Amino acid sequence: MGKFALNLNAELTGVKNLAPKDEESFYYAFKVQCSGCREIHDNAIEISRSETHSIPGSKGEANLIWTCKNCRKTCSFVIEGPFSPYNDSQETKKVLVLECRGCELVEFIPQGEWIANGAESNTLFDEIVLEDDWYDYDENASSEVSITNLEWSISKA
């Protein structure tokens, strides 16, 4: 069993509280490495806290049960706690913790829609895509806002 932290470091200009748009139904995408055969799989897995599955041979549940296509080892993933909104521009911060059994997280793939608030105006920006740098204009604060230099990392929690 291993607990992994998803960490974020980004430059926020004029925005705060960066988080998934709808955390309950949001799908986090990761590349994984099987702890049995050590294969890093090409296809990403997607995990949502809204899904629960029974763990085979156990009384427990997980957000995702996945089987390695090479060695057939069964792996389980549990999202622990809520996403912690990112506010600390240019500071690495743990934003999510996952418990993984049978495999390890090796890369986060940002996808889906994210939200943030204007730092001065509290304007809601609710269609942020983080596949690249993001820029917009906060009309209430009369200033440009942006999220740039995103660096996602995974560490032991």
Curated annotation (Swiss-Prot):
InterPro entries: CXXC_Zn-binding_euk (IPR008584). Keywords: Metal-binding, Zinc. Disruption phenotype: No obvious growth defects. No increased sensitivity to oxidative stress caused by exposure to hydrogen peroxide (in vitro). Pfam families: CXXC_Zn-b_euk. GO terms for molecular function: zinc ion binding. Requires a bound zinc ion for normal folding and solubility. Zn(2+) binds at residues 34, 37, 68, 71. This is UPF0587 protein C2D10.03c. It comes from the Eukaryota. Belongs to the UPF0587 family. GO terms for cellular component: cytosol; nucleus. The keyword Transcription does not apply. It comes from Schizosaccharomyces pombe (strain 972 / ATCC 24843). The gene is Ess1. The keyword NAD does not apply.
